Amino acid sequence: MHALSFHQSAGPARPQAPWLWLIAGTGEGPQLATALLQAGWQLRVSVVSRAAARAYAPQPGLQLVVGAIGSSDAGATPLAGVRQELAGSRTRQQPFRWVIDASHPFASRITAALVQGCGEARVPLLRLQRPELAGGAVELLADLNELGGQARRGERWLLAIGARRLAEAVHQTPEALHHARILPRPQALQQAMAAGLPAERVACLQPLPAGAQRARVEQALCRRWKIETVLCRRSGGPGEAHWRAICRELGLRLLLLERPAEPGALLSLPLQQLLERVGLATQAVGEPSKGQPSQEF
């Protein structure tokens, strides 16, 4: 990982408590981490940025690792990062009893790397299944190549799909007047500029938890730019619900980019079922780490 930063929370140690590796963001991650800590687990939580790390309150048994998985060295890959993390846990004599993938549904490279790496190491892997949200006037797109013909000439669009695919979205909708909401990172800004977006139509916003404050900021952005159509990702969970609410309140058209298919061998469970599957840490103390059947990796 790049520029790793470790934050071990203050509080009594749990020398006998088993370890679990959680890969998450700011949506369901903090809630899931708290529930697992309350169940007695020690957690090593991987987040992409320091801003994401601030969503996790310091708690006994919680260790945060900041940085994209597999970005510590030039040419490194997510799979190399997963292998390194799993090997490191054994070296520290803190082997993971479970790995939980609560990463963004569109972080498909991370999920694929976790499936392969955990399969090789025989460490049980679970995927947090985000809900399928319904309701409201939305249009689903299987991929960005379905954007052709969706935009009227001069129609004001807000692209909230992350920076990596901005150029593709702009190319598919040349008739639209594009605006973008991106994370405040140099690479994201470079990608927005490379897509041909002028600086005055790019907003670099720090991620905020879904709620009233975030809604006010992005509603104000839509009003200022006179947005007519929003393109975002069908990620499930707080992020998608947030954009659904904004578009409903402001009367905007909402286009949702369908999430990529996940590996068929990966066991995905809703939050409560996932917690039940992992169980209490006290039930795992003294037991060997159990590999899952091959179809669950």
For each predicted feature, which ranges?
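C-terminal functional extensions of proteins
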Residues: 222-225, 229, 233-240, 246, ...
